[in-house]
Amino acid sequence: MRRTLYRLMIELTNGRFTSYILRKFAQSRLSSIIIPSYAKVFQINQDEMEKGLKEYRTLHELFTRKLKEGKRSIDTDASSIVSPVDGVFADHGPIEDTKTFDIKGKRYSIVDMLGNEERATRYAGGTYMVIYLSPSHYHRIHSPLSGSVTERFVLGRKSYPVNAAGMEYGKEPLSKNYRSVTEISSDGEHMALVKVGAMFVNSIELLHERDTVQKGEEMAYFTFGSTVVLLFEKDMIEVVQELKSGQELRLGEKIATRLAHK
């Protein structure tokens, strides 16, 4: 019953008109009125922001803010996979040979997430990692490794919450929401960086257009908090053992080791 009521309420409020109004407000100068309250409620770390709070003219500018130079360091070990974002480590685990994985009691299909069987097949038997970005986090997304970009594509139309309630009661938000996917080949192995849109504010803006990417290089930004899913081929990585669900991660922090480089 809770799941049914939750989905009904989301469907009633999650329309194009609502999204349009919220997006327009966030991009308007009028939204600057609530910036101080927003920063206080979500406890935004103002010491790390590139500009002072009063210099942001709209909520959109605050959402997509940059950090001061030197506030994040990228792990330089050739064998390391780094966190592509500031966020909360949600979970990791194996991708079954059936091209599915389980998180928070819900089964997700890689075929659904990536849009077809061919893309999904290369990740069968591999590893997934999920990182959640709250409204307080830095919203820019960077590359977790160096390599060649093999494909960029967008799937889905609407987005549903990816917070705790959304993960429990929603309908596979990680594989059904609007999402932007970048696949990267590195030393003959593939990984997919899946950027999942948030409810109401779907926008994921791509900033990287070249065929190659360096570890830690900026690739995109969310216009609100959301989630990234990392998919790796079989025997490609070993997740850092100390990582725990609910742990805060910082951009550039080592989260896994490349097995081919050990």
Curated annotation (Swiss-Prot):
Pathway given in the UniProt record? Phospholipid metabolism; phosphatidylethanolamine biosynthesis; phosphatidylethanolamine from CDP-diacylglycerol: step 2/2
Q: Write out the annotated subcellular location.
A: Cell membrane
Catalytic site: D86 (charge relay system), H142 (charge relay system), S226 (charge relay system), S226 (schiff-base intermediate with substrate)
Q: Which InterPro entries match?
A: PS_Dcarbxylase, PSD-B, PSD_type1_pro
Q: Where is this site: Cleavage (non-hydrolytic)?
A: G225, S226
| Cofactor binding notes | Binds 1 pyruvoyl group covalently per subunit.
Q: How does it sit in the membrane?
A: Peripheral membrane protein
Where does it mainly reside? membrane
Name a single GO biological process: phosphatidylethanolamine biosynthetic process
One Gene Ontology term, aspect cellular component = plasma membrane
Post-translationally, this protein is described as follows, namely: Is synthesized initially as an inactive proenzyme. Formation of the active enzyme involves a self-maturation process in which the active site pyruvoyl group is generated from an internal serine residue via an autocatalytic post-translational modification. Two non-identical subunits are generated from the proenzyme in this reaction, and the pyruvate is formed at the N-terminus of the alpha chain, which is derived from the carboxyl end of the proenzyme.
Sorted keywords for this record are: Cell membrane, Decarboxylase, Lipid biosynthesis, Lipid metabolism, Lyase, Membrane, Phospholipid biosynthesis, Phospholipid metabolism, Pyruvate, Zymogen
Pfam families cross-referenced by the UniProt entry = PS_Dcarbxylase (PF02666)
An MF annotation (GO) of this entry: phosphatidylserine decarboxylase activity
Q: Pyruvic acid (Ser): which positions carry it?
A: S226
Q: What class of enzyme is it?
A: lyase
> What is stated as this protein's family in its record?
Belongs to the phosphatidylserine decarboxylase family. PSD-B subfamily. Prokaryotic type I sub-subfamily.
Q: How does it assemble?
A: Heterodimer of a large membrane-associated beta subunit and a small pyruvoyl-containing alpha subunit.
Q: What does this protein do?
A: Catalyzes the formation of phosphatidylethanolamine (PtdEtn) from phosphatidylserine (PtdSer).
What is the protein name for this chain? Phosphatidylserine decarboxylase proenzyme
Could you tell me the gene encoding this protein? psd
